[in-house]
Amino acid sequence: MLTSVFTMKRNLLKVPVYMVLAGLLLAGCGKKTDKNTSSATGWKINAKEGGFQYNTDFKDQETGPGLVLIEGGTFTMGQVEDDIMHDWNNTPTQQHVQSFYMDETEVTNKMYMEYLDWLKRVFPPDEEQYRNIYIGALPDTLVWRSPLSANEAMVSNYLRHPAYAEYPVVGVNWVQAVQFSSWRTDRVNEAILERDGYLAKDARYQVDATSTFSTDTYLNAPSQTYGGKIAGEMGGKKTNKEGEATYAKQTSGILLPEYRLPTEVEWEYAAKSLGGIREYNSLQGRKKYPWDSQYTRSTKRRTRGDLLANFKQGKGDYGGLAGWSDDKGDITVAVKTYPPNDFGLYDMAGNVAEWVADVYRPIVDDEITDFNYYRGNVYMKHAIGEDGKQIVVTPENVKYDTLMNGKIIARNLPGNLATVPIDSNETYLRYNFTHSDNRSYHDGDKSSTRNYRNQNDLMAEGSEYTNSMYNAPRPKRPGSDISGKGYDTSNDRTSLIDDEVRVYKGGSWRDRAYWLDPAQRRFLPQYIATDYIGFRNAMSRVGSKAKKNHKTPKG
């Protein structure tokens, strides 16, 4: 009797196991999904006969040269310490940032010199029509001068001397930093296309002013790349079944997004690197600096007492005593001199402050958006010619902008596609945006009120600046000669803020420790360069948030 009972119990325990195994076998017999078969139509993808072609083998975005992946998340943007300066321009707000990439270090003199060398070789400044392309990209080395300082050695040597090769570039204004970023995008993608066989070997060394590479042109008007030479000697080995050259497309997944300046929220998020104080889904405390300490000196046993950034320590003290240099430098120091933060980024506090993409306003308007916050959107589209094709910038039709300080800068390099602001064709009956230029969006000016009519009515009332919230000085924009320069001497200006002032973040070798806090924000006109502001690049991440999709207990 007992034996039969035990047998029944054992059989009952076995039943679920058999059922599970049977279920697994049935599931395994189901039809497998073929990645090269459309789940919409059942047609073949990437068939030799033709039809829809798509990169079904794409795994993950390639990490561009010099970049580090910053996994996105939520954080408190703004000052969490006492506002001793009473600026009231960085009130804490909760923001979320998408994953992105950022340069491991600031852009160095050597990196910028590579840019200048390329411009000089492709657009020789001794030829009149190209002169302003090269000259407009030159950093302002005179930023080192001071009426009561002997700094002429820095004026002559800092940019070009190999002793400063790995030091951060300075004397670069915001506009120049943006243009370097665009140039870098094209050079990186050009190398990728050559590596993957879409361009001829060493094609990038055979360019001149009439045959340069542009990522935008390659994607949208590929036959016009290299001034139309891509169909000949510049083309790669990849061909279709007819023997014609093939081009990489957005669907190929091999070209990288653009290098650009980071937004303010990206820069601050990356600088704070809160992963180091995270446990599971909560933060254990808060950070005052990019490192996990309330002090500017190391608390680790091996390096205890060492400074963790390059900054001004006191009046007349930029580096300590001879033989016992506190921060290893008087001015800037080589990148990677100090330990990185928890994201692996160097010099996010000290050395040089850094330009970010945003137009400055005292308030970060989290009521409008708390996701990828950015003030500065100006939406553009490709210019279309009379023949219905996109217009490619040539040496003959390149346009130049004259900045407020008289510096002349090329708007687009030859080989790029010309752009114009979007118009009613793109904004008609839209809810998410209504204008091309959104730099002053919802900043308290007349267009932000319920009585706002339309932009044309405002312009008809008088000057375009009459109704602006921030009534900044407007110096006369210089002409082609020095006599065209003039200052705004009116007495009714109330602010230095306008749509051409940009945020810069972080402390520098000239700043006291207060400015090392990543939440601090300052601004300057985008045409101004200094001896303490540099920059680094960022890049958007496409696809998944992280390379590894599993959670970790600690950052």
Language-model segments: which ranges?
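Bacterial N-terminal signal peptides that target proteins for export
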Residues: 4-17
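Bacterial N-terminal signal peptides
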Residues: 16-24
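C-terminal motif of bacterial Sec signal peptides marking the signal peptidase cleavage site
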Residues: 26-28
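Functional-site microenvironments in short loops/helix caps that host divalent-cation chemistry
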Residues: 33-48, 69, 76, 81, ...
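N-terminal low-complexity, Pro/Thr/Ser-rich intrinsically disordered segments
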Residues: 42-60
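Short, P/G- and charge-enriched loop/turn segments at secondary-structure junctions
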Residues: 55-57, 87-90, 491, 521-526
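A short glycine-rich, aromatic-capped structural motif
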Residues: 59-152, 165-188, 350, 534-535, ...
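Catalytic loop of the DD-peptidase/beta-lactamase superfamily, centered on the K-T-G motif
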Residues: 520-528, 533, 539-540
